[in-house]
C-alpha cells in the first residue's frame, strides 16, 4: 500500500441529521444542568415544518423541550420560511417515556465503582500523528471546511449562504505519509439570487483557500463546488433528518473502525458514547507519548457489568514498544469501567451540544482530548 487515496466527508450544523443531533444533545445538556445523574436517550426527527423529539428519559429535572428545540434551530440559522424551515413556526412534537427499570437495575449500584454498563457493545478510539490534533487529515480538513462555511455565513462575509452544507476531501498518501490533496468537494445551500460562477469563486476564495494548506494543493487538485449547479432547497425541506445517522462524520471519517453506536442524545452511562470518548483519550495519549504513530483502541462491555469484557490495542506496526506492554499500560493507567471513565473525563456536565456538529474528536477543549497521561505512559514504557 505504497500510494493510495483516502477520502472523508463532513456536514455542516444545518444538515438535517446534524440539526437532529444538536437538538438531542441540547435536551441532554439542559437536563444534566439540573440533574447530573439523569438517564437520557433522546432521539429527534426533523422534516419540513416539523420536529419530533422522542426517547426514554428518567430525571428529576424539568426542561422545556419546545423552547430548547426552537432555540437550537434558531442558533443554526433556520429563521425564515424561505429556507424551508423556520424555528419560529415549525411544529414541535414530544414523545418521551422513561428508561426501563430492567436496565436501571443493571446500571445503578450502591457502590458507584460497580456501576454496570448501560448496554452491551463495542467501541473504538483512534489517534494518528499526521495532524496537530492527532486526528486523520481527511476528516480534520473536511470538518474545517464546513466550519468555515458556517463562519462566513454567520458573520455576513457571504450573506447568500444558507445553513446546509457538505464537504469531502481526498488525500494522496505515499507510504503512509500525506503528499497532497487530490480532490475537494464542497456543496453549500444558497439563496436564489447568487449565480453559479460568483458562488464558486467566493467559496474558493473565502472557504477553501483559507482552510486547506497551500503546499497540499497542486495544479492537478480537482475542485467540485456545488457540482449540481444549484442548491437552493436544503435542510429539512430537502431531506428528513434523524439523530445518529452521521456516525462516521462524528468520529474518524472512516479511517478507523466503528462499533456502530451513535453518540448524540445519550447520557454518559451509555457506553456507546462515554467509552468511545475514553477510547479516543487512551489512543491519543499513546500517540502523544510517542509510543506509536497510529493507535486504535477497542473496548467492549456486557450490560450491567462494570469491567470491560475486552480491551484491544492496535498500532499497525508503528509501535515503539511491544504491543503486549501497551495493553498492560492501558489497563494500569486508564479506568475503563463505566463509573471510572465518567470520573476520569468528568462527563457529568452539559458539554454535549457542542460535540453534535463538526466532530466529537480533534477539538482540544473537550476533556477526552487531554494528553495529561502522555508523560506518565512514556516514563512507564521506559522511553526517555
Curated annotation (Swiss-Prot):
SUPFAM superfamilies: S-adenosylmethionine synthetase (SSF55973)
Residues annotated to bind Mg(2+): 17
A biological process from GO: S-adenosylmethionine biosynthetic process
Enzyme class: transferase
Reaction catalyzed: L-methionine + ATP + H2O = S-adenosyl-L-methionine + phosphate + diphosphate
Keywords for this protein: ATP-binding, Cytoplasm, Magnesium, Metal-binding, Nucleotide-binding, One-carbon metabolism, Potassium, Transferase
Entry-linked HAMAP family: S_AdoMet_synth1
Protein name per UniProt: S-adenosylmethionine synthase
Designated gene of the protein: metK
Amino acid at each position: 500500500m505504497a500510494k493510495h487515496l483516502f477520502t472523508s466527508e463532513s456536514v455542516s450544523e444545518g444538515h438535517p441529521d446534524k440539526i437532529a443531533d444538536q437538538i438531542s444533545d441540547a435536551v441532554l445538556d439542559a437536563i444534566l444542568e439540573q440533574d447530573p445523574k439523569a438517564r437520557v436517550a433522546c432521539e429527534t426527527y426533523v422534516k419540513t415544518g416539523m420536529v419530533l423529539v422522542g426517547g426514554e428519559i428518567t430525571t428529576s429535572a424539568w426542561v422545556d423541550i419546545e423552547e430548547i428545540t426552537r432555540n437550537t434551530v434558531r442558533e443554526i440559522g433556520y429563521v425564515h420560511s424561505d429556507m424551508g424551515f423556520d424555528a419560529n413556526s415549525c411544529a414541535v412534537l414530544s414523545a418521551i417515556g422513561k428508561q426501563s427499570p430492567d436496565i436501571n437495575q443493571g446500571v445503578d449500584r450502591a457502590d458507584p465503582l460497580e456501576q454496570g454498563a448501560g448496554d452491551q457493545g463495542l467501541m473504538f478510539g483512534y489517534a494518528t500523528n499526521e495532524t496537530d490534533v492527532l486526528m486523520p487529515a481527511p476528516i480534520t480538513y473536511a470538518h474545517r471546511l464546513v466550519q468555515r462555511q458556517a463562519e462566513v455565513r454567520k458573520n455576513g462575509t457571504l450573506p447568500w449562504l444558507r445553513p446546509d452544507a457538505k464537504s469531502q476531501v481526498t488525500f494522496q498518501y505515499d507510504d503512509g505519509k500525506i503528499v497532497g490533496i487530490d480532490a475537494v468537494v464542497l456543496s453549500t445551500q444558497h439563496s436564489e439570487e447568487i449565480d453559479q460562477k460568483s458562488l464558486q469563486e467566493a467559496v474558493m476564495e473565502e472557504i477553501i483557500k483559507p482552510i486547506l494548506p497551500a503546499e497540499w494543493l497542486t495544479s492537478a487538485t480537482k475542485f467540485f463546488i456545488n457540482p449540481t449547479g444549484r442548491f437552493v432547497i436544503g435542510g429539512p425541506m430537502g431531506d428528513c433528518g434523524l439523530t445518529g445517522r452521521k456516525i462516521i462524520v462524528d468520529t474518524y471519517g472512516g479511517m478507523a473502525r466503528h462499533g456502530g453506536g451513535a453518540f448524540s442524545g445519550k447520557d454518559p452511562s451509555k457506553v456507546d458514547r462515554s467509552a468511545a470518548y475514553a477510547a479516543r483519550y487512551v489512543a491519543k495519549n499513546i500517540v502523544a507519548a510517542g509510543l506509536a504513530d497510529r493507535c486504535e483502541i477497542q473496548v467492549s462491555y456486557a450490560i450491567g457489568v462494570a469491567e470491560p469484557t475486552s480491551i484491544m490495542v492496535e498500532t499497525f506496526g508503528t509501535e515503539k514498544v511491544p504491543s503486549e506492554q501497551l495493553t498492560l499500560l492501558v489497563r494500569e493507567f486508564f479506568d475503563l469501567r463505566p463509573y471510572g471513565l465518567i470520573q476520569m473525563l468528568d462527563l457529568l456536565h452539559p458539554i454535549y451540544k457542542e460535540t453534535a456538529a463538526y466532530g466529537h474528536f480533534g477539538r482540544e477543549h473537550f476533556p477526552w482530548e487531554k494528553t495529561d497521561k502522555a508523560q506518565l505512559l512514556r516514563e512507564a514504557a521506559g522511553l526517555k
